Amino acid sequence: MAIPKVGINGFGRIGRIVLRNALVAKTIQVVAINDPFIDLEYMAYMFKYDSTHGRFDGSVEIKDGKLVIDGNAIDVHNERDPADIKWSTSGADYVIESTGVFTTQETASAHLKGGAKRVIISAPSKDAPMYVVGVNEEKFNPSEKVISNASCTTNCLAPLAKVINDTFGIEEGLMTTVHATTATQKTVDGPSKKDWRGGRGASANIIPSSTGAAKAVGKVIPALNGKLTGMAFRVPTPDVSVVDLTVKLAKPTNYEDIKAAIKAASEGPMKGVLGYTEDAVVSTDFCGDNHSSIFDASAGIQLSPQFVKLVSWYDNEWGYSRRVVDLVAYTAAKDN
């Protein structure tokens, strides 16, 4: 089967890390990038140098108005309106929508006008079908032209929640994500009309925040709809986050059996998506980790046979971007 050709709209954190992952995974080929705010020279610079993931280990050049990475020429567009991007001229059948702006079916479907067959939104969506690789991708229907890869936190939480619910049953639960800083935050205190706390300086504060990640699990795993909710604490670290899932179980059990169930899933049906460790790890140990979720067996605690706190790490940039690549490749295979 031919490798699917892909366009990326929005060359920010996720757009750039998706490209790095695509070059490593080799399951998709990026043939075009659109960003109205980044010219070609700056695009090459931003891709080559990364404060979190390090310098790109390969060649980055500009030739004939194209971005050339390791000999692969990528067309560059600078359109503001997705409907104006000529994806077809580059042969891009699939578009990764990573601006964070066009997150509904209506707005993201504008890419279809330029020749794309399908749009994969790298963010949660209010109305597009959401898929978490390793959890519910088998429900994908090729007739769906706009889909969402959900959020990085949902991608961490859903595999863990699925294993626990399938094995022991979840009656209800609360999630907290201790989340690394992202681009929407402020370097120093600044205006943030909708979220006053979110306007405070990212490097100086632990900032309580809202997140729809836990509720979104109910869309991905219908059996958990209405059973989970959660919140976030934004912390002054550049990357890698951690989920704390505290649940009331339907079936009494012990922590060793919980560990065994998660370990079995990590070595079986969820291999590559769900990881497992018993080491004394900290956040930087997971920078660049491909997994969506890495269960920290030695960090969890159990209060009673039906009440337990589980801890799972995730690289909210790298691991999430790898799943975006995986979802594109999966849907493309279903088209053939």
UniProtKB/Swiss-Prot annotation:
GO biological process per UniProt: canonical glycolysis; cellular response to oxidative stress; glycolytic process; positive regulation of p38MAPK cascade
GO MF annotation list: glyceraldehyde-3-phosphate dehydrogenase (NAD+) (phosphorylating) activity; NAD binding; NADP binding; oxygen sensor activity
Annotated keywords: Cytoplasm, Glycolysis, NAD, Oxidoreductase, Phosphoprotein
Pathway stated in the Swiss-Prot or TrEMBL entry: Carbohydrate degradation; glycolysis; pyruvate from D-glyceraldehyde 3-phosphate: step 1/5
EC nos: 1.2.1.12
One Pfam family matching this protein: Gp_dh_C
Residue sites binding D-glyceraldehyde 3-phosphate per the record: 151-153, 182, 211-212, 234
Location, primary (coarse class): cytoplasm
Site (Activates thiol group during catalysis): 179
Positions bound to NAD(+): 13-14, 35, 80, 316
One GO CC annotation: cytosol
NCBIfam families listed in its UniProt record: GAPDH-I (TIGR01534)
Family the entry assigns: Belongs to the glyceraldehyde-3-phosphate dehydrogenase family.
Subunit structure: Homotetramer.
Protein name per Swiss-Prot or TrEMBL: Glyceraldehyde-3-phosphate dehydrogenase 1
Origin species: Schizosaccharomyces pombe (strain 972 / ATCC 24843) (Fission yeast)
Organism ancestry: Eukaryota, Fungi, Dikarya, Ascomycota, Taphrinomycotina
